[in-house]
Structure formats: structure tokens, C-alpha cells
């Protein structure tokens, strides 16, 4: 029985996923297939490279090193400087273990939305560092805020436009069951509705009519995916973990709020760890109340936050 791991996006909300995955890595839980979407792609990279804490530190970087915000707008005239995050972080501020990643044996894919077709395409890379990073850039290139990324002769933007939670794709890849990490506390919370920005989208992507259609249909397709997820969860074929507290802004800059969501992801996964282990092994899940202690990594990072804030 093959189990896949699906990681939803959500920009800074991906810090919740980082907490969940750090707890899984501490317990040596790795799945043979992983698919990341948007910010979920960054989490997938650190999970496959087995770097506990890396994504959390990257998302909650000090303002002087952050890849988004007013500072970046003043420096590069963009609110989001993906080139800094994608091509600089892995070699400087937050070193990425390419060797472990490429030798992991895990099949990992990244969902990207093709501008020419409006469809989701899934990329993987097992040896080329630059191509891997370009794929990572494409999956999290937010419409209206980022330029399309050229890859293999076509252009791509955020994977969540065409497939926010690629459950069907994971099943097509041979997964019998899936673990899904969500970044929204409630399935009734819809993703960004780009139909509200119809005029802007039509103007900016007039050369990509299929992409415009994908933006307009996003919420409808998302709701269909949620219905499938709920069905699989009822059938015991999906293990879903999502925040149980009010979430933060997608571009939150308050380090303490960000760390609170990280700690929540970590401790929530800790509480449900035995339930997941039982589910992984096909046993009837048993809920185990294990509040535990605050993760040492979170405490260490809290100290970093205080130092960074002066």
C-alpha cells in the first residue's frame, strides 16, 4: 500500500506545515511520494532533504533577510523577491542539502500552473540544482505579484491556481492513501478568489486566455477537491491535519504570530502522532492526548526572534 504526502500552499501560513513536518522528521516518518504546491513546495524540499527547522527559519527570516515586504519593494521594486528566496537562500542564509535531497529515494513533485494551457503540470528533478530551484520558483509565483517563470519552453505561475490540493494526481501516481497537510483551519475558508480581480487578470494575462479561465474557475475547482478530500477522510483513505486555531495573514510579518502558528503545527502533530502511526499501519486510529512540551526548536527560534527585533 503506497501512501502519499500532499502539502497545500498558503505563503507564510506554510509555517504551520513546517511545524507538522519537523515533528514527522523527528520521528523518522517519511513517505515515498510527496507533492508540494506553492509554499508547500518549499516545505517539501526541506522534508525530502531531512533538514529540520530549515523552512521555519526561512519563512520567519529577520526583516533584513526577508524576501517580501517594503524593503524588497524599495530594493528590487517587487513586493515579493522570489529570486532572493529561491536562488540565494539555499546557498547563503539557509543552506539546502542538495546531496541528501537527490539521494533520498523519495519521489517528489511540484505543481505548477501552465499559462499556455491553464492546466496543472507536475515537475520533478533528481540532479540539476538550478532546474530544481526554478521549479520551486514557478510553483510559488503568485499571480499579479510575480512574473511567469519560463521552464522547458513554457510559462508557469503558482500551482494552486489549477490544483490547490492535488489529490487526484496523487491517486493517479499510484497512491492508495494520502496524508494531507492543510494551512487553513476550516474547509469553508475559500482560497483567493481571482474573479474579484477579473479586470486586472484579463489585462495582465491577455496573452494567456486559458490561464485567465483557470483563475476564474479556481474556487469552484477547490470546492470539488475539498469534497473529494472529505470523502476519502470518511473512508479512512486520507489523514488530514489542519490548524485548530485562527490562522494568520498570507503575508504576515509579525514574527511572534508566525512562531505561534509554527508551534501549533508542531504540537498538534505531536498530539496526533500515535493516531497517524496507527493509520499508517492500517490499524483503527486511536486518539492519544499528548500535549507534551514546547518544541526545543521553537524555543530556540523565539530567542532568534528577540535578537532580530533588538
Annotate each language-model stretch with its function:
Residues 1-37, 45-310:
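Patatin-like phospholipase
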Amino acid at each position: 500500500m503506497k501512501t502519499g504526502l500532499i502539502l497545500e500552499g498558503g505563503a507564510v501560513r506554510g509555517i504551520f506545515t513546517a511545524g507538522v513536518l519537523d515533528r514527522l522528521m523527528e520521528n523518522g516518518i517519511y513517505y515515498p511520494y510527496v507533492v508540494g504546491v506553492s509554499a508547500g513546495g518549499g516545505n517539501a524540499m526541506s522534508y525530502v532533504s531531512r533538514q529540520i527547522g530549515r523552512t521555519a527559519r526561512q519563512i520567519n527570516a529577520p526583516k533584513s533577510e526577508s524576501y517580501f515586504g517594503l524593503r524588497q519593494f524599495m530594493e528590487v521594486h517587487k513586493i515579493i523577491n522570489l529570486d532572493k528566496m529561491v536562488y540565494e537562500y539555499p546557498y547563503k542564509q539557509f543552506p539546502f542539502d542538495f546531496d541528501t535531497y537527490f539521494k533520498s529515494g523519495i519521489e517528489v513533485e511540484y505543481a505548477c500552473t501552465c499559462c499556455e494551457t491553464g492546466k496543472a503540470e507536475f515537475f520533478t528533478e533528481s540532479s540539476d540544482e538550478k532546474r530544481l530551484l526554478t521549479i520551486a520558483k514557478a510553483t510559488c509565483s503568485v499571480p499579479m505579484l510575480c512574473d511567469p517563470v519560463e521552464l522547458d519552453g513554457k510559462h508557469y505561475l503558482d500551482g494552486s491556481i489549477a490544483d490547490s490540493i492535488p489529490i487526484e494526481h496523487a491517486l493517479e501516481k499510484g497512491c492508495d492513501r494520502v496524508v494531507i497537510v492543510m494551512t487553513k483551519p476550516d474547509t469553508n475558508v475559500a482560497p483567493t478568489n481571482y474573479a474579484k480581480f477579473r479586470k486586472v487578470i484579463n489585462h495582465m494575462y491577455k496573452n494567456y486566455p486559458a490561464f485567465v479561465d483557470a483563475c476564474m474557475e479556481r474556487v469552484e475547482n477547490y470546492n470539488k477537491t475539498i469534497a473529494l478530500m472529505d470523502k476519502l477522510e470518511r473512508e479512512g483513505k486520507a489523514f488530514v491535519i489542519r490548524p485548530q486555531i485562527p490562522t494568520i495573514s498570507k503575508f504576515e510579518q509579525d514574527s511572534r504570530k508566525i512562531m505561534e502558528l509554527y508551534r501549533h503545527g508542531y504540537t498538534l502533530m505531536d498530539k496526533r502522532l500515535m493516531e497517524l502511526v496507527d493509520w499508517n499501519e492500517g490499524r483503527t486510529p486511536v486518539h492519544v492526548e499528548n500535549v507534551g512540551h514546547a518544541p526545543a526548536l521553537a524555543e530556540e527560534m523565539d530567542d532568534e526572534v528577540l535578537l532580530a527585533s533588538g
